[in-house]
Amino acid sequence: MNPLISAASVIAAGLAVGLASIGPGVGQGTAAGQAVEGIARQPEAEGKIRGTLLLSLAFMEALTIYGLVVALALPFANPFV
């Protein structure tokens, strides 16, 4: 395998994980902060807010997992060879 293609694949894998984690990380922090604020304002709605928060966090985390899958596919199942 060409070393240049191999090096570019490793760099692309790192960028895929890094860039795929930025958006969900910011979104999860914002969602958690808003959930805490909502629970502080309406403590009786804690269960509903927590359930909605956990579901939305799972959807956001899926984006990071997609980035990880792409990052693992680049070095091991290299489509550029």
From Swiss-Prot:
The answer to whether keyword Cell wall biogenesis/degradation applies is no
Subcellular location(s): the record lists: Plastid, Chloroplast thylakoid membrane
Question: What's a Pfam family in this record?
Answer: ATP-synt_C
Cellular component terms (Gene Ontology): chloroplast thylakoid membrane; proton-transporting ATP synthase complex; proton-transporting two-sector ATPase complex, proton-transporting domain
Swiss-Prot/TrEMBL keywords:
ATP synthesis, CF(0), Chloroplast, Hydrogen ion transport, Ion transport, Lipid-binding, Membrane, Plastid, Thylakoid, Transmembrane, Transmembrane helix, Transport
Q: Tell me the GO molecular function terms.
A: lipid binding; proton-transporting ATP synthase activity, rotational mechanism
Stated membrane topology is:
Multi-pass membrane protein
Alphabetized InterPro entries for the sequence: ATP_synth_csu_bac/chlpt, ATP_synth_F0_csu, ATP_synth_F0_csu_DDCD_BS, ATP_synth_F0_csu_sf, ATPase_proteolipid_c-like_dom, F/V-ATP_Csub_sf
Question: What transmembrane ranges does the database entry give?
Answer: 3-23, 53-73
Provide the site residues for: Reversibly protonated during proton transport: E61
Similarity comment: family membership: Belongs to the ATPase C chain family.
Q: What does this protein do?
A: F(1)F(0) ATP synthase produces ATP from ADP in the presence of a proton or sodium gradient. F-type ATPases consist of two structural domains, F(1) containing the extramembraneous catalytic core and F(0) containing the membrane proton channel, linked together by a central stalk and a peripheral stalk. During catalysis, ATP synthesis in the catalytic domain of F(1) is coupled via a rotary mechanism of the central stalk subunits to proton translocation. Key component of the F(0) channel; it plays a direct role in translocation across the membrane. A homomeric c-ring of between 10-14 subunits forms the central stalk rotor element with the F(1) delta and epsilon subunits.
HAMAP family tied to this protein? ATP_synth_c_bact (MF_01396)
One further remark on this entry is: In plastids the F-type ATPase is also known as CF(1)CF(0).
**NCBIfam families associated with the record:** ATP_synt_c (TIGR01260), PRK07354.1 (NF005608)
Task: Please describe the quaternary structure of this protein.
Answer: F-type ATPases have 2 components, F(1) - the catalytic core - and F(0) - the membrane proton channel. F(1) has five subunits: alpha(3), beta(3), gamma(1), delta(1), epsilon(1). F(0) has four main subunits: a(1), b(1), b'(1) and c(10-14). The alpha and beta chains form an alternating ring which encloses part of the gamma chain. F(1) is attached to F(0) by a central stalk formed by the gamma and epsilon chains, while a peripheral stalk is formed by the delta, b and b' chains.
Recorded protein name is: ATP synthase subunit c, chloroplastic
UniProt organism field: Huperzia lucidula
Taxonomy of origin reads: Eukaryota, Viridiplantae, Streptophyta, Embryophyta, Tracheophyta
